[in-house]
Structure formats: structure tokens, C-alpha cells
Amino acid sequence: MTSEQIKMARAAVGWSIDQLADRTDVSSRTIKRIEAQVGLPAATEANLRLIRETLEAAGIEFIGEPGEGPGVRLWTKQN
């Protein structure tokens, strides 16, 4: 999961940085720092796991490989 994917996923579910922070117990400052990076984020494994699991629970699927155009897909009840 890349920094860009986190930012795309957050936008897809319509959450602000503060909303993601509230849902994950990861500080908004940390999320801002992660999203400002390029590629694979330098962050603790625990924080990245919390972010991933929270976004996946909201319907996000992380697709692609970091070096091959990674993206996200939002699954809804209609998919």
C-alpha cells in the first residue's frame, strides 16, 4: 500500500484526514506525513495496518503493485 493509495482511498470514501484519524486512532499529523510521502510510506507497521484495515472495512480494495501503477477500488453494495 503506497502513500498515494492511502490518499486516493480516503478521498474515495469521502473522509477528511481528521475523520480517518478518528477512525484509526492514528494521529492526523501522522496521516498527513504518510500522505505527503511518495511510494511506500515510512511509518510503523501498526499504523499502516490500522489505516489499511479501516479503509478496507469501508469498502476499499487496494489493487496493483507499488511499481506498476497501484490504485484503489471502492466496493459498494451495488458491486
Q: Could you describe each region identified by the protein language model?
A:
Residues 60-79:
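Helix-turn-helix/homeodomain-like alpha-helical modules used for DNA recognition
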Residues 1-2:
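Absolute protein N-terminus
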Residues 6-19, 77:
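Short basic helix-loop element that most often maps to the first helix and adjoining turn
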Residues 9, 23, 34:
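Residues in the recognition helix of alpha-helical DNA-binding motifs
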Residues 26-43:
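Recognition helix of helix-turn-helix/homeodomain-like DNA-binding domains
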Residues 24-25, 45-62:
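DNA major-groove recognition helix of helix-turn-helix/homeodomain DNA-binding modules
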Residues 17-27:
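Short, composition-biased local secondary-structure segments
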